[in-house]
Amino acid sequence: MMVQDLLKIKKNEYYTMKNIVIAAEYATRLGELTKNFPKPLLKIGNSTILGRILDDIDKIDDIDEHVIITNHKFAPIFEDWTKEQNYSKKITIIDDGTSTNDTRLGAVCDLLYALDKLNINDDILVVAADNLLFFSFSEFVDFAKSKATSCIMCHEEPSIEKLQRTGVIVVDDNMH
């Protein structure tokens, strides 16, 4: 290996990361609104929930592909949506084969299914597609690269009502 090749590696020119978007939920709590339409593709202003997420992540140089894992019921809708998009990174839709909320795989199994199906060995950014976010993932990706280990993003939520509807972690004083 030449010195210039080592410098390229040091500058992360060979570093790649896949963005895996978990979009296989059935959003049953939203009733008729999402009975036959995926929650991540609901309109928010001039975009969609998923569109807002990808607009941000697509700008991260280290990301080389967006992998969207969805269910069989909504896969054709995601495929059609993808054809209308103009992101700089490739978008791959993965159908997890489930057709009902009762047969869903769950987020972790969907992630494992996508990793196995595409034989992904790169670092990954895993994002839930059903959350409206108001921040950029760029700093988080830089942080994860600098730590060279698994990183989990979380935020403090003071509302007990909101905490009762979501996953909760408990941390000690050593959390960084």
Q: What are the language-model segments listed below?
A:
Residues 1-16:
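N-terminal amphipathic/basic-hydrophobic helices that include classical n-h-c signal peptides
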Residues 176:
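Conserved FAD/dinucleotide-binding core of flavoprotein oxidoreductases
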Residues 14-77:
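N-terminal glycine-rich phosphate-binding loop and ensuing alpha1 helix
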Residues 9-10, 57, 121:
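Low-complexity, intrinsically disordered/propeptide-like segments
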Residues 5-8, 34, 116:
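Compositionally biased amphipathic helical and low-complexity segments enriched in hydrophobic
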Residues 76-173:
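Conserved beta-loop-beta/alpha segment of the NTase-like Rossmann-fold superfamily
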